[in-house]
Amino acid sequence: MLISIPKDVKYIIDTFYKNGYEAFMVGGCIRDILLNRTPMDYDIATSAPPEITEKLFKKTIPTGIEHGTITVLIDKNPYEVTTYRTEGTYSDNRKPDSVTFISDIKEDLARRDFTINAFAYNDRKGLLDYFSGNTDLNRKLIKCVGNPDKRFKEDALRMLRAIRFSAQLNFNIDEKTFAAIKVNSSSIQNISKERIRVELSKTLLSNNAFSGMIKLEESKLLKEILPYNLNLDNSIDKVNPNISSRLAFIFLNLEPSLVESIMRDLTFDKNTMNKVISLTSSFKDIKSPDSKADCKRLIIKVGKDNIFDLINIYESINSKSVPDITNLVKEILDSNEVLYIKDLAIKGNDLIKELDITPGKILGELLNHLLNEVINETIDNDYASLITCAKNYIQNS
């Protein structure tokens, strides 16, 4: 089987061979090529010790030298090059306590997580597939290399990766592999929240998010990482594939304070957290609007940048479009109608001068009153109308 090797990768492999060492393109990049997908990156395994890798290439970074990994830079493009190795015990369910560098590619591939990631290829020896990974690709099956219980005890993150690959590729999970996930599910607590966030996000953003979430539930992993009353429904696959919308969908049953706590715990960034909270807290307010003013207030509550994602979540759950809301929102936004105090045709300083009032609580109340009147379309957004309304408000206060 011939596989096209990118120029930079070929240069790295050829450099090792010219200097008496072996090297292969390995892992997920070969899986992706065999599935006619574009690899995100290319990893290389070699019989050369890491110090030799550093000598053979001009620009390198010792990213994981203690485990044999050197990043080689070719025209600023990074390629991870790792020495063939076996691994010692895993006392933390994440990283080996020790590694031993070896010269046998088959022994190196035997430590990989899944058969579909245990490939090696170069144009001298062709495709090496010692663990029937190609068969499992054709069977659309996620299966551990060797003993699945051992694989998951070595690295508990592999359990989330199995389900993530299943969702991304629309593959089933081998029965023994899935059974081992159930048995070892509690050990996911040994994995950092950041790594859990990354895998959960990839599952949620896949084309088969519902299937992935159900597998997380059935495997007992979900109760370990998100033990809450989540909204698990197949309509999630219709939700816009951005992480804020997908998270908001599964968190619809939860109070905003709990959503915030969960997202902080999982180390989500502040912008994503705020958007998810806006979407979940505003969902109950979306309905066929009684007036344009109601629609404006919905936009104000959820934010201009989030309103169409909110509509999309509503449409996904109800399996119907809501053109009356969508069209009204578009009309409001396209015509730049007043939504915020800053949109008013008058400023706080104008009111201070015209009405001889002092900055403070009364000024804030006055500006909010003017905004409500404009939103309700009881007055126009022009200077004269706003001043008249403001004077009346002050007189009646």
Residue ranges of model-derived segments:
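Catalytic cores of the polymerase beta-like nucleotidyltransferase superfamily
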Residues: M1-S397
